Amino acid sequence: MPPLHAGRPGPLLVLLAVTLAAAAATAVGASSDTAPFYPSAEEAAAAHCEGTLYPELCLSTLADIPDLHTKSLPDVICGTVNRTKDAVAATSYNCSHYINSKYLTPRDRLAISDCMELLDTTMDELQATTSDLESPAVAGGNNGSASMAAKRVTMDHVMTELSAAMTNQYTCLDGFDYKDGERVRHYMESSIHHVSRMVSNSLAMAKKLPGAGGETTQRQPFMGYGQMANGFPKWVRPGDRRLLQAPASSITPDAVVAKDGSGGYTTVSAAVAAAPANSNKRYVIHIKAGAYMENVEVGKSKKNLMFIGDGIGKTVIKASRNVVDGSTTFRSATVAVVGNNFLARDLTIENSAGPSKHQAVALRVGADLSAFYRCSFVGYQDTLYVHSLRQFFRECDIYGTIDFIFGNSAVVFQSCNLYARRPLPNQSNVYTAQGREDPNQNTGISIQKCKVAAASDLLAVQSSFKTYLGRPWKQYSRTVFMQSELDSVVNPAGWLEWSGNFALDTLYYGEYQNTGPGASTSNRVKWKGYRVITSASEASTFTVGNFIDGDVWLAGTSVPFTVGL
C-alpha cells in the first residue's frame, strides 16, 4: 500500500522541508535520546518526523503535544503512542457497536470479532511500549546508568511490540477477504489504517534511539531476536531449556490431560482454562497420547504455559475449521497461542480440513518468546501462522501446500523439516509467505539448517506440480534460507510472484550456503529484492542471535539452538 505522502506534497510537507535544515542546525544536545534544544515546536516536530512514512500525520500528531521542543525523543514517542491508544480505543468502541448491526452476516460478525481481539492486543502492546520507553534503560539517555546492552534489550522489546501492533491492523482487514466482505472492510479500513500509520510513525522514530539498531548495521535487519547458546536463543531460560530437553518421564507436570480419564482433565482446553492467569512461573501440562478433537486457545492471560506430549503422531490435537465453511483464517487455527513465553514439545497439531477447504490453520502463534521443540504441524494451505512477535522452532516437521508458513513474526526455524504435500490440480506449492508491511518492522522468516523436501504423497508426482520457496504476501516481505538442504522439488526459479510486480523491488529474499539438487541459484528469479548472500556477516544477521534476541530468552527453555552460522 503506498504511503500517504505519495504524489504532490501537502502544506505540512512543505513546512517539514523548510524547517528540517534549521532544526538540524539549531538542535543542541549530547544525543538523540536526551532533550536537545529546538527554537520552536515546529522545528522539533520537523526533526522528529524526518524519516517517517507518513510525515503529515506525524506533524499533526506532534502538534498536540505541549512544549514539544523541550521534550526528549522517548517522551515524544510516548506522546505519539498515547495518542495512538486513543485511536485504538475509539476504533474498538465503534466495533463494539457495529458488530450488533442487523445488516451483518455471521461471517461479518466473526471478522469484526477478530478485529476487536486484535485491537485489544494492540492496546496491551502499546502500553508495554510506553512502559519500556519510560524505563531507566531508555529514558535515562546516554547519561543514565543503563548499559548499551540493557538499552538494546529494552529497545528490542519496543521495536517488537510496535511491529506486532501494526501487524494486528492488517490482520484485522485481511479478515474481510471474502465475497461481500468489502462493504464491511470499507467501513473499518479508514480507522484501522489510521492506527497502523500512527504506529508506523512511532516505529520510525523509535529506530533513532540508541540500542534500536539504527546506529549499527550489525543489528540489522533482524534486530531484536538475540544471541544463541547451546542450540536455543538465550531468551529461553535455563529452567525452560531443561524442560524441553529432559526425558518427559523426569518432569512432574502441573496438570495431566488424558482421553481415558486417567488424568485430571479429558480435554486440553479444560486444562488451559484451569491454569493460573498471568503467572510468572512455568505451568506444565502433560497431554498423554491420544487424538484430541478440539480447538484450543491459549489466551493472553495464560502466560508461561508449556504443553508436553508423548511424541509426534502420538499426542495429536486436531480440528477442521476453515475459510470455505465460514471461518476467518485467523480464527481457523486448531491451536491459537497468544499468552507469552509459551513452550511446546513432542506433539502434533493438525488441521484436517483438506486442500479443498483453502485456508485452514493448524497453529497460530502471537505469543512473544515462544518456542516449539520436536513438534509437527500438519495441514494444507496456511498450516503454520507465525503471526507476530518472537518465535523459535527446533527439530519440527511442517506439512502443507500453499503459503504453509506465513505471518509477520520474527521467527527462526532450525533443523526442521519442511514438507510440501500434493496440492489440488493446477495449484502450486509455496513454502513461505512472509507478511512484513513496513520497512522498519523487525520481522521476517529465517530458515536455517533445515530440510526442504516433498512429502510422500507429492514425491511420486512432483514433476506435475511446481513448488517454490516463497512469495511476497506484503510489500516488504523478508525471508532467508540458509545452510539448508533443498531437494529437487524446489523449482529452479526458486521464488514466485504474488501478483505481477507487487513487492518485487521492496522484498528481501536471500539464500546462503544451501545444498542439494534444488539449491542451485543459476536460474533463480532476477528481482531487485532477491539476492544470493555471499557475506557471512550479512547472513549472520538472520541467525537466532541477531534476529530474535534468542541469546536472552531461549537459554531458559531447554530447547537446543545454534546461536550463529
Regions found by a protein language model. Name each.
Residues 2-6, 30-42, 178-193, 199-565:
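Sequence-level preference for short, compositionally simple segments enriched
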Residues 9-11, 62, 67, 141-142, ...:
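Flavin-dependent oxidoreductase catalytic core characteristic
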Residues 54, 61, 87-94, 118-132, ...:
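Amphipathic, well-ordered alpha-helical segments in soluble domains
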Residues 157, 162, 166-179, 195, ...:
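Alpha-helical bundle protein-protein interaction modules that mediate dimerization/oligomerization
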